[in-house]
Amino acid sequence: MSNNNFKDDFEKNRQSINPDEHQTELKEDDKTNENKKEADSQNSLSNNSNQQFPPRNAQRRKRRRETATNQSKQQDDKHQKNSDAKTTEGSLDDRYDEAQLQQQHDKSQQQNKTEKQSQDNRMKDGKDAAIVNGTSESPEHKSKSTQNRPGPKAQQQKRKSESTQSKPSTNKDKKAATGAGIAGAAGVAGAAETSKRHHNKKDKQDSKHSNHENDEKSVKNDDQKQSKKGKKAAVGAGAAAGVGAAGVAHHNNQNKHHNEEKNSNQNNQYNDQSEGKKKGGFMKILLPLIAAILILGAIAIFGGMALNNHNDSKSDDQKIANQSKKDSDKKDGAQSEDNKDKKSDSNKDKKSDSDKNADDDSDNSSSNPNATSTNNNDNVANNNSNYTNQNQQDNANQNSNNQQATQGQQSHTVYGQENLYRIAIQYYGEGTQANVDKIKRANGLSSNNIHNGQTLVIPQ
């Protein structure tokens, strides 16, 4: 016999599930894009939920495992999408910062156009104006860098303001360099070397402070733009050698000053952060220790108080127990004394009772002969009285019989099963209770019982 004979209709008609098809679907989902993956996973879940004949035993457990893995995978995909969306938001913020910087740069260019005309007039008057300006501004920058360092928030605001101020100055230098159209290749070579040195220094500084890249993206972007502007200014200064070299020197001095100030600010910020971390870490260690010590001290105090109270209560209980024992002993002693007194009194009473009984016995022994004599006399008197009574009754009966005979009363002898009622019917015509009572009074009967051969007097 096959195993199908032992299956019911449910098992015979249920749908089979092939895990291989599910595996192929998962592989195809991995190959396709994310939208198709979500659609296929939802379809697979809906197919599993819409089955009319769910599997049993091992196949059911396997399907549950597969659905659980699909659900966990969907959750991971959603989490990945959310993280990607957050990263894109951050990139948009960076783009917004770059756009804002570009707008500021355009504004600075417009301002520089207005200043260019005045600068051209200055160039006509004297070519050494740029050098004089560079030498006069350098001590001011040094004095600014040697001032007191503010807090981290103030430093960030200061950086932004200085970066915005440095842009118009670089534009001024650029225009001054382009305005000198006479210098040759010597100015170009010097400007290229200085720009390369500045760029190399900037790369080294960026590599040293790579841990603080997220906080200083705006400053780096400004430096890169300034370096590009410096290169363009150096290339454009092909005609003016002396004046162009002076403008490039001024630009390099300003960049050096800016880089030194940036490095000092970064070092100060790093030191402040490290000191804050040290202080915060030390306080984080101290606070739990102090809290634990306080908690342990409080527990010890309360525990000591509880132990003292417990010991005091024990001593009080012992005192009360001892006092109660003493009181019970006193009561027992008093009761024993009372019992002894009662026993002695009862013994005395018993002795007196025994003496009384002895006296009574002696009295009874003396009174017994007299009592027997009196009893004998009483018996004799009773016998005499009984004899006289019998004589009187006999005489009375005789007299009554004589009277009845004289008066003509009738007599009746009982035969067979006669009774007083039949006798009353026979002589009086009616067997009433009054007639029966007459017969009973005449014969001195107390009951209705009569016997055969008995003679009865029947009154008229």
Swiss-Prot record:
Residue ranges, compositional bias (Low complexity): 41-57, 177-192, 264-273, 364-411
Domain LysM: 410-458
Membrane topology label: Single-pass membrane protein
A family per Pfam: LysM
Compartment(s) of residence: Cell membrane
Domain of life: Bacteria
Keywords per UniProt: Cell membrane, Membrane, Transmembrane, Transmembrane helix
Family matches, as SUPFAM superfamilies: LysM domain
PROSITE patterns from the UniProt entry: LYSM
Gene Ontology CC annotation, any one: plasma membrane
Biased composition (Basic and acidic residues): 1-40, 74-128, 203-226, 313-359
Descriptive protein name: Probable elastin-binding protein EbpS
Organism: Staphylococcus epidermidis (strain ATCC 35984 / DSM 28319 / BCRC 17069 / CCUG 31568 / BM 3577 / RP62A)
